[in-house]
A protein has these predicted regions:
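C-terminal "cap" of GNAT-fold acetyltransferases
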Residues: 2, 120-123, 127-169
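Conserved GNAT-fold acetyl-CoA-binding loop/helix
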Residues: 4, 8-11, 22-51
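A short helix-loop-beta-strand connector motif used in the catalytic cores of GNAT acetyltransferases and
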Residues: 49-63
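Conserved beta-strand in the GNAT
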Residues: 64, 70-78, 86, 91
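Glycine-rich acyl-CoA binding loop
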Residues: 73, 87-89, 98-106
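A conserved beta-turn-beta hairpin within the catalytic core of GNAT-like acetyltransferases
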Residues: 79-90, 97, 116-118
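Conserved acyl-CoA
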Residues: 104-121
Length: 169
């Protein structure tokens, strides 16, 4: 990996961001079906530019990672409650996983959550098959917790997810 750049995505980046989010959801839904033996239907596999508004300022943040100028990963913050933000759609292209792109994005999200969004708590959910992601989250001080209010995971499927939280200093 030659050059990693992280930056806030703007409207000019929508095609790259939507492409990465669609790749993530396609992979996640296929892996879910392969792992658990049934399909999870989701309209979220079809992201739109308008849907990205929930991840943009003033109540969110959308980060695009680029390696050598090409889209490499995406991650988002979304406000939940006063002082609480949620990490969503964190994804690194498979061929770049293991090269610290995800850890760099997570570190930036945590910094921006505290400094720019005034968050005291960061939450996230992650399917149980995403064990590499769990190690990353735990290495940054996230602890497992019960499902939280506002999670988009249906109640009947929550046992297949891990829910995390970290208090910011």
């Amino acid at each position: 990996m030659d050059q990693l750049q992280l930056r806030e995505a703007d409207a000019a980046d929508d095609a790259a961001v939507l492409g990465l989010m669609t790749q993530y959801m396609t992979w996640a839904l296929a892996t879910f079906e392969r792992t658990y033996g049934f399909a999870m239907t989701s309209t979220e596999a079809r992201h739109t530019g308008a849907a990205l508004a929930a991840f943009r300022r003033p109540s969110g943040l959308l980060v695009l990672a680029e390696v050598d100028g090409a889209p490499a990963g995406v991650a988002a913050l979304r406000a939940q409650d006063d002082g609480v933000v949620e990490i969503k759609r964190m994804f690194v292209r498979p061929e770049l996983q293991g090269r610290h792109v995800g850890s760099a994005m997570l570190d930036l999200l945590l910094e921006q959550a505290r400094e720019d969004l005034g968050a005291r708590v960061v939450r996230l959910d992650s399917n149980r098959f995403m064990t590499d992601a769990h190690r990353l989250y735990e290495s940054r001080g996230f602890v497992e917790r019960d499902p939280y209010p506002g999670s988009e995971i249906p109640a009947e499927l929550q046992h297949l997810w891990r829910f995390y939280e970290r208090t910011l200093d």
